[in-house]
Amino acid sequence: MLSKTQIEQFNNQGYLILKGAIDELDIQRLEQGVANNPPLDGTLDPNAPVYPNPGRYTLATQSARDPDLGFIIEHETIVNSARDLLSDDPVLTAYVIYDRTPDGTGLPVHHDYKRWRPVGSSMHWLFTIVPFCDFDETSGPLYVAPGSHRTERVHSGETPCLEVAPAIRPGDHEFIDPGLQRGDLLLMNMHLWHRADANRSNHHRVGLFNKYAAASYPPATGYYLFHDDVVNALSEEGRKLIAVHSDREIATTRAVLVREREETEVFFLETEDGLQLPGGEIEFERAIPDWDRGNFIASCQQYLREQVRIETPWLSYIGDYPEGDGLCRVYGYSFNDNGFPVGYRGIWLALSQVPVERLCSRWEIEAVERWLDPKFIRGKGLSQAACRVDQFAY
């Protein structure tokens, strides 16, 4: 359990280092896991370098199904520290190991709240970073800018989702080398600006860069969907750390559209099969290719344009529900009173008056209620294309 002083340091500075928190035997076990699972997940960029040529390589996706990698997900110090700092039960949103090979280039200044990424669009998450070697001058320090997270930028707005004011980029002089060493645990706020130097050593610079979100703050794009095999590699208690998992693929996406009248109303399309939420089969958006597939906002918005003739400025994740042989990723949007008063291709029904027997999937009411549930605190998800022009778009 973290002390009050440690929690205050994290809140004020945006990071906290627990020296030597990860046992040497655990690091060695992780190294064996990496040896058995080459870091080839990458960015899906066809022009990316070929491992192990100079570059930065990613081990992610479903790699945690290997017990020699997955065990660290439920490491007591990591999980308890995340719980203390998030003030909520933590759930894993990303399992990532980076391998920067000799002469691999560094990363420029950035922070990692990103509204298009399953691993970056929760409104309350943190990094748990564990170096497998000393991040020194030769292998490449990870620099942080203390206090640059500026959480006062996050505030309530006129919608059910939180608003975020534009980030303030720190000056070069504000970055420090925190002196990370093998086996340390760096806990880092999602908004903290950081950068990494190139690897000028003759050995690989490897580290664990997992992300945990507060359970009540789902990613705006939806979670990266872990396979059941990942969950089965964990203990019964550890399985609580995986928010969503399945042996099915996400195949469709739909939108819950609500508005407030005398009571909450929900929009449905009237089809031959019954009442259905607008949406359809997914298409993978490849505007910003990366490993954490799961953002189907572009597909959902396309269906809303075609079926409802509306362009929503954002959508936010509700849940994944069975549809056919796959899963349906469902997003939500709440109308305000400023829309132009035209009719829609479909029907608005008071929530209490929806005829359940006419619903196509039977889970629609559950999805609406989850969207309206105030215990979930959401952000505004964007498509990849919307974020190409400004990766820190708010």
Which stretches of residues belong to each language-model region?
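Non-heme Fe(II)/2-oxoglutarate
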Residues: L40, L44-D45, L192-R248
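Active-site-adjacent beta-strand/loop module that shapes the phosphate/pyrophosphate-binding cleft
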Residues: A213, I250-A251, T312-P313, G319-Q353, ...
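Double-stranded beta-helix
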Residues: F135-D197, Y217, D229
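Short, conserved beta-strand element in jelly-roll/cupin
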Residues: V119-E137, G179, K211-A214
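Conserved Nudix-box catalytic region and its N-terminal flanking loop in Nudix hydrolases
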Residues: E262-I310, Y394
